[in-house]
């Protein structure tokens, strides 16, 4: 009787998982960062903090309401290609956020980010398990969820501090 075969995986085998964990970090930091910068954002677009807070509320509603329908609509698309498109749209939307000088432009860009977010998390879990090295799917999924946790614990506080110091 032979002992079970141990698979050894180098760094290269973990690159897709690390990439997904980083994407989870960026998506979650992006989602929650405006909470800490709300007064700065409101001042920059010359709106009240309460009205500007709608960029957070509407974001949450868009994600909540569109996650299931958009997941169904994109179910037949190849996941890696879909993820790449989501990241491109996510990045472009953030460039619009960066240059938004009115509430309407900011809200429109945040809605686009929320749409990408609504699909991102629905495909992330199965994709994380699929790209992890053989036999390490649970660890791969945990690593991706770890990216989300690190966003909450480090990304948002550090991003808020930097945004308050140098401008959002």
Model-derived features: where do they sit?
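Conserved MFS/SLC helix-loop-helix module at the cytosolic interface between two early adjacent transmembrane helices
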Residues: 65-104
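Small-residue-rich segments within alpha-helical transmembrane domains of MFS-like 12-TM solute carriers
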Residues: 28, 32, 98, 114-122
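Small-residue-rich transmembrane alpha-helices and their cytosolic helix-loop interfaces
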Residues: 24, 56, 60, 87, ...
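Cytoplasmic helix-loop-helix junction between adjacent transmembrane helices
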Residues: 103, 109-147
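Residue-level signature of mid-helix packing/kink "hotspots" within the transmembrane helices
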Residues: 32, 60-68, 152-153
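Extracytoplasmic
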Residues: 16-49, 67-70
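Helix-loop-helix hairpin linking two adjacent transmembrane segments in secondary transporters
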Residues: 103-105, 135, 143-168
């Amino acid at each position: 009787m032979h002992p079970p075969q141990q698979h050894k995986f180098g760094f290269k085998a973990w690159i897709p998982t690390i990439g997904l964990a980083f994407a989870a970090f960026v998506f979650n930091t992006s989602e929650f960062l405006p909470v800490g910068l709300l007064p700065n954002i409101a001042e920059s677009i010359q709106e009240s903090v309460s009205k500007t807070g709608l960029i957070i509320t509407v974001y949450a509603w868009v994600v909540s309401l569109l996650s299931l329908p958009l997941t169904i609509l994109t179910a037949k698309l190849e996941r890696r290609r879909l993820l790449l498109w989501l990241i491109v749209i996510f990045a472009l939307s953030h460039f619009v956020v960066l240059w938004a000088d009115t509430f309407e432009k900011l809200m429109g860009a945040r809605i686009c980010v929320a749409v990408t977010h609504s699909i991102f998390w629905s495909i992330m879990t199965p994709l994380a398990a699929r790209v992890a090295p053989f036999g390490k799917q649970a660890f791969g999924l945990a690593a991706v969820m770890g990216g989300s946790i690190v966003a909450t614990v480090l990304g948002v506080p550090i991003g808020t501090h930097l945004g308050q110091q140098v401008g959002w």
